[in-house]
């Protein structure tokens, strides 16, 4: 019995030791850095670059271009820097400055952060050689169901700077901890992180950590992220207030009573409202909306429907974006358990909320 117990305890210690080896301490910056792209400050020089592996087109093949990616943090931000060298800098591709408009033909730098370290959900941040920003959420461990497992309508607050030279292009990201949701244990935080570079001319993806291409979206998969420990970081309760004011002018002309002249009238409609977002805890966010103006939301893509079935349009209203992945439950096939765009609607049209 004693030998059996000793063997069991040895196995437990081996498992704990093996799991502990998977954790890495994310390096902390030793000084200030300027968000300008090159990442040549002394504080960056002490941060080791990540070990990168070719993800595609040949798993663990030899990359054709040199890449250096570094990730670090301080009390308020997570930083990521990338040096993307290119032997033909004139061939670097970037097509748009519009947010969330990264093209498959663009050179891309991406950071995926599983801030809760739950191996299920993550936040993605991308930039191109032009310095545009793309942000999205990943849900369902990046396993496709009825489409890509992303919500590209999600936006948050963060910054990026990019510079191009005759050696390639260089980028720096700065993501506030207030834009991330996470739980801390007396200032100790665990997060999963994936970083990769996409080189479109050669269809190459180099990635950290080493992830095999066994899944369609393996380079976005939270359960395959490298687990990091951050010390001295505490969850934040940010308050965001977004007011809006709308005004217009209208003119009309109507015949008078005896139809001898036109009476001109004018009106100036005005409308105001605001949205408030407050993080009560790391798991609970309060969203308030006063006189919501959903007309200011990005318009849906036009589609032609020649069937008797309704079209599916993605949710783009920020009010419904917070942790929306919790409701992404499918029922098999094209059916979806919860679809926020149908709130207040029936087959006959809008539903009266009062009166």
Positions of predicted regions on the chain:
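Structural preference for beta-rich elements and adjacent junctions enriched in aromatics
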Residues: 20-355
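Positively charged n-region of N-terminal signal peptides that target proteins for export
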Residues: 1-4
């Amino acid at each position: 019995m004693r030998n059996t117990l000793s063997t069991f305890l040895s196995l437990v210690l081996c498992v704990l030791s093996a799991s502990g080896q998977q954790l890495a301490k994310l390096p902390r910056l030793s000084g200030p850095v300027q968000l300008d792209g090159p990442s040549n400050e002394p504080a960056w020089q002490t941060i080791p670059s990540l070990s990168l592996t070719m993800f595609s087109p040949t798993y663990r093949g030899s990359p054709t271009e040199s890449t250096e990616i570094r990730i670090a943090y301080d009390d308020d931000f997570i930083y990521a820097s990338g040096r993307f060298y290119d032997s033909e800098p004139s061939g670097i591709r970037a097509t748009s400055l519009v947010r969330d408009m990264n093209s498959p033909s663009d050179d891309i730098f991406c950071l995926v952060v599983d801030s809760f370290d739950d191996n299920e959900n993550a936040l993605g941040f991308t930039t191109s050689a032009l310095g545009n920003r793309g942000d999205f959420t990943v849900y369902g461990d990046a396993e496709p169901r009825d489409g890509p497992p992303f919500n590209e309508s999600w936006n948050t607050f963060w910054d990026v700077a990019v510079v191009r030279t005759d050696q390639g292009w260089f980028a720096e990201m700065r993501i506030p901890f207030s834009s991330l949701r996470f739980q801390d244990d007396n200032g100790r935080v665990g997060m999963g992180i994936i970083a990769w570079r996409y080189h479109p001319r050669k269809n190459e993806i180099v990635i950290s950590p080493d992830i095999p291409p066994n899944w369609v979206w393996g380079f976005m998969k939270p359960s395959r992220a490298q687990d990091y420990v951050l010390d001295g970081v505490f969850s934040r309760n940010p308050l965001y207030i977004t007011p809006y004011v709308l005004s217009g002018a209208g003119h009309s002309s109507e015949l008078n009573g005896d139809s001898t002249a036109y009476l001109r009238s004018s009106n100036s409609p005005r409308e105001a409202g605001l949205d408030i977002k407050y993080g009560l805890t790391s798991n609970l966010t309060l969203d308030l909306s006063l006189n919501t103006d959903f007309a200011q939301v990005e318009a849906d893509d036009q589609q032609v429907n020649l069937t008797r079935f309704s079209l599916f349009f993605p949710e783009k209203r920020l009010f419904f974006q917070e942790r929306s992945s919790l409701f992404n439950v499918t029922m098999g096939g094209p059916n979806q358990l919860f679809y926020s765009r149908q709130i207040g609607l029936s087959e006959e049209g809008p539903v009266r909320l009062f009166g």
